Amino acid sequence: FPVLGLDSRGVGGLMNSFPPPQGHAQNPLQVGAELQSRFFASQGCAQSPFQAAPAPPPTPQAPAAEPLQVDLLPVLAAAQESAAAAAAAAAAAAAVVTAPPAPAAASTVDTAALKQPPAPPPPPPAVSAPAAEAAPPAAAATIAAAAATAVVAPTSTVAVAPVASVLEKKTKSKGPYICALCAKEFKNGYNLRRHEAIHTGAKAGRVPSGAMKMPTMVPLSLLSVPQLSGASGGGGEAGAGGGTTAVAAGGVVTTTASGKRIRKNHACEMCGKAFRDVYHLNRHKLSHSDEKPYQCPVCQQRFKRKDRMSYHVRSHDGAVHKPYNCSHCGK
């Protein structure tokens, strides 16, 4: 405040020295602003130092000047120089393409040697069969014919090539199965047996249609008959579920008329007849006994098998259809 020239009374005394204007309400803010402006006006200031100075108006910028033609002369000169260099390069490339070829060097090939006829090829080596294996008659004849052809025409390359291929085909082994009559080889035994049937005139693995089929029987000497105990029912009765008997030497194999092989491992210890399962064996054992465990509930007739008894019971109530009648008695 001493800078502004205030005395010891301070700001309060300064404000009292300037009476507020009359004619309007006493607004503290408005009165303070008026007093402040009157004070700075008396001190010779245009405005209050606490107020920000107004920003100066923007200075208008002058428009950019266009380049003169003198400034563009270096650019035009550089463009002309690049066009001249491109034309010179194109002319040099055209001169290289249209240049005549260089004269060829003198040939050092002996043309007289080329006019001479070619020398005959050397004769092929003699083909000999290995001593360890005996060649079949057909293969031996083929080898002899090939050797004769090689001796007669040693310079014929066209005739030697087919003979070599024939020898390669004939000497190639197909398998270890060889026919004893014609020495033909096969890959497996099945094909060999079919081939041997051609020599004998019989079909392999087939039974003649007129041949009589006999039931498969097993000698009793091959059977192992167990000792029957009293706990098993005794008497060899099959109705109580008798056991099975294994056939010695791996069982019996039967071949049907269609060529199907059936293995029968269960044999009857009384007659030696063989069966393929236990069911048919037990049903067969009923024929050796006199026991008839199944009885008809209507007429008390007894049967060995249950299916026979069931069929008989149906005949009592007329459930069994009998379409066949006797021509003599009508039954």
Curated annotation (Swiss-Prot):
Q: Which portions of the chain have biased composition (kind: Pro residues)? A: 117-127
Q: How does it assemble?
A: Interacts with BPTF.
Source organism of this protein record: Mesocricetus auratus
* A Pfam short name: zf-C2H2_4
Q: Where is this region: Disordered?
A: 46-65, 108-131
The record's account of tissue expression is: Ubiquitously expressed.
The listed locations are:
Nucleus
UniProt entry tagged with the keyword Ribonucleoprotein = no
**Which UniProt keyword terms apply here?**
Activator, DNA-binding, Metal-binding, Nucleus, Repeat, Transcription, Transcription regulation, Zinc, Zinc-finger
MF (Gene Ontology)? DNA binding; DNA-binding transcription factor activity, RNA polymerase II-specific; zinc ion binding
What's its job?
Answer: Transcriptional regulator. Acts as a transcriptional activator that binds to purine-rich GAGA sites found in the promoter of many genes including insulin I and II and islet amyloid polypeptide.
The record's section on PROSITE patterns has: ZINC_FINGER_C2H2_1, ZINC_FINGER_C2H2_2
Record-given protein name: Myc-associated zinc finger protein
Q: A GO BP term, please?
A: negative regulation of transcription by RNA polymerase II
The UniProt entry, under InterPro entries, shows: Znf_C2H2_sf, Znf_C2H2_type
Zn finger limits (C2H2-type) = 177-199, 266-288, 294-316, 324-331
Q: Name one GO cellular component term.
A: nucleus
